[in-house]
Amino acid sequence: MEQALREYYLPMKKLTELEKSRRNNQAVLILFIVGVLVLAFICLFVGSSHMSIAECFGALFKKGSAAQVRIIWNIRIPRVIAAVIAGAGLSVSGLIMQTNLNNPMASPSTLGVSNAAVFGANLSIIAFAGGFLDTGNHLSSYTVGANPYATSLMAFIFATLSILLILGLCRLRAFQPGVVVLAGIAIGSVWTAATTILQFYATDVGLSAAVIWTFGDLGRATYRTDLIMAVVVLVGFVFFFIMSWQFNALLSGDAAAKSMGVAVDRLRFASMLLASVITAVCVSFLGIIGFVGIICPHVTKRLLGHDHRISIPASALSGSILLLLADTASRCLGNGSALPVGAITSLLGAPFFLAIIFCAVLSKKATHFLKDGFLRLKFVCAATAKRCIAGRLS
């Protein structure tokens, strides 16, 4: 009777736990959405031009002075939109890379995208005189040739070339994760070496413009660049979310995923290509922004688990939150100008990443210590019991 009751109530208990987990996940997602909205609102009021909250509200509804309206609508709003879109895109791309390669150290730049984009931008600025420095203090105070998109276009072309080259090489070895990582490191080193040679022969102005371009700067964003990034990120997000159950199957291993009907090689090729294109677009317009694609997937997986139906939207929201925080910090810490947001994300990300590594090591040591202590205690108890039994029998 007791066994029958246990078998009857056990499925109900599991359903209750699943419902509780689902509600917790929904609560965290709602909290992330609120965080994005609040931080985006705060970012509108932070900047080098000191405006009161009332003046910002007036400019937001186009009731302030012409200069204030121009600052809010032409500078700050495109910047906030870029932070939300780029943060989401880089974070989701990092999550997809980590899933495909089964490597927690993987990032959106694993395929050498950032290195190739930097080379393309340097080639445009140095070799084709694509940029010259202005006398302003802002990080984005240089103009890129006659067409402001020339350098971004060149950066995107070389980033895409790097993606296709690495994925083409990896198809020869059936997309083994180790081969992908090693190929990315090798090709990335080639792009870095080529960039160094270009900078060696550059003029002072060209070198300064090239180095400034590599700084991650949301101040370059315009409504047009935001629209391009939004379209690419949205297409990638929809594709990844539709394929979320296949990514969940991939977590069980290639053999298990294939037994469930997943075309593993095709999934890896398509998803890594799309994740790299998202990264290439963001880097081409905004420069190098590191650690977003590593930190945020780790945070969401620790909070919400590995189910991609939850972790994909959660990673997107957490990436937006991180980049909004970094952008706000860069404008608050800069003396009259914004610091490179890429430097802020690295300063925030490096200690966090080290903390994850050390916590994992300490947790592993603690587990071994507890297991060893339990085995010793078990051995002592067994030996004591044997002595007691032997004493009674004698």
Segments and roles (model prediction):
Residues E2-F374, R387, S394:
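Alpha-helical transmembrane segments in inner-membrane proteins
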